[in-house]
């Protein structure tokens, strides 16, 4: 009915001493982006003005069990994956991100993965289509999402690691083109309940995956939908050791969309919050020399 499960194991590699080389003193340096826009179109213009030239989108959707109750306050007690005449939070986020990044996507092909259902749990992902076929544009993403949701058994626990490694494989197969992985999820990575706040296996795996991904031309944007809590994700960056560049950002979709503004301004605010760091990260990945990608890839192989 949809794509087969795909296992993406942790890449074993040596310690890396190389770091991103940032362009300096150049007219191509990312420019400051203001924080008030009235429409998604204005945000698109701001991203282009700030230096974003090309970006390919990868989407990852959370199908863990908590989606059934995480909309108690923010989505009228309905499942966050409820399909009806009113777009659910996942559909809203997909649409806004898709509309914002599509002008920068040359082929408009969007690889889409699901995770956290009863077939994948925290150890693999599934593609929306067989043989990992991408969707053509965000409109097909939404159409395919609506088709598969009724047939999924929500489960867990939550780990972003398999999804991040799947995105890294997409980057490899694209000849190392720059991509943005947008993870839309209703909850943070599964934590332990221990008083000494030890990291759970899912947190450890996700942190390692984010570090590994920083050696790829790949930005990761985590979009939080539903009631949360989000305290751990908001401080997640602090737990991540040195990376080739700062490649992870969390955005609270619910907080932004619950403000008292008209819808076009809320959509613009969300698009900006999710993507305002992308021009800087795009430039950082351009600074990573191809030889550094090759070195990292060889470390994975050997």
Task: Give, region by region, the residue ranges found by the protein language model.
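Acidic, low-complexity intrinsically disordered regions
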Residues: 1-302
């Amino acid at each position: 009915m949809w794509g087969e499960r795909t296992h993406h194991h942790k890449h074993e590699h040596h310690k890396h001493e190389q770091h991103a080389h940032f362009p300096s003193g150049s007219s191509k340096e990312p420019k400051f982006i203001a924080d008030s826009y009235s429409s998604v179109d204005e945000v698109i213009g701001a991203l282009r003005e700030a230096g974003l030239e090309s970006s390919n989108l990868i989407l990852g959707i959370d199908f863990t069990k908590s989606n059934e109750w995480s909309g108690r306050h923010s989505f009228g007690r309905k499942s966050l994956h409820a399909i009806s005449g009113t777009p659910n939070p996942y559909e809203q986020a997909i649409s806004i991100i898709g509309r914002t990044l599509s002008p920068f996507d040359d082929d408009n092909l969007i690889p889409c993965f699901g995770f956290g259902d009863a077939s994948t749990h925290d150890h693999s992902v599934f593609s929306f289509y067989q043989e990992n076929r991408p969707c053509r544009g965000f409109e097909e993403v939404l159409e395919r999402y609506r088709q598969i949701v009724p047939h999924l058994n929500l489960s867990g626990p939550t780990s972003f690691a398999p999804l991040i490694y799947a995105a890294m494989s997409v980057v490899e197969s694209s000849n190392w083109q720059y991509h943005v992985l947008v993870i839309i999820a209703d909850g943070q990575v599964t934590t332990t309940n221990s008083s000494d706040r030890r990291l759970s296996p899912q947190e450890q795996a996700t942190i390692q995956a984010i570090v590994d991904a920083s050696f790829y031309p790949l930005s990761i944007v985590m979009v939080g939908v539903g009631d949360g809590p989000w305290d751990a994700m908001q401080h997640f960056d602090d737990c991540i050791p040195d990376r080739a560049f700062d490649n992870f950002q969390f955005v609270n979709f619910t907080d932004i969309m619950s403000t008292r503004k008209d819808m076009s301004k809320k959509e613009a605010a969300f698009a900006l919050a999710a993507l305002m760091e992308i021009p800087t990260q795009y430039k950082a990945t351009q600074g990573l020399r191809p030889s550094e990608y090759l070195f990292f890839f060889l470390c994975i192989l050997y």
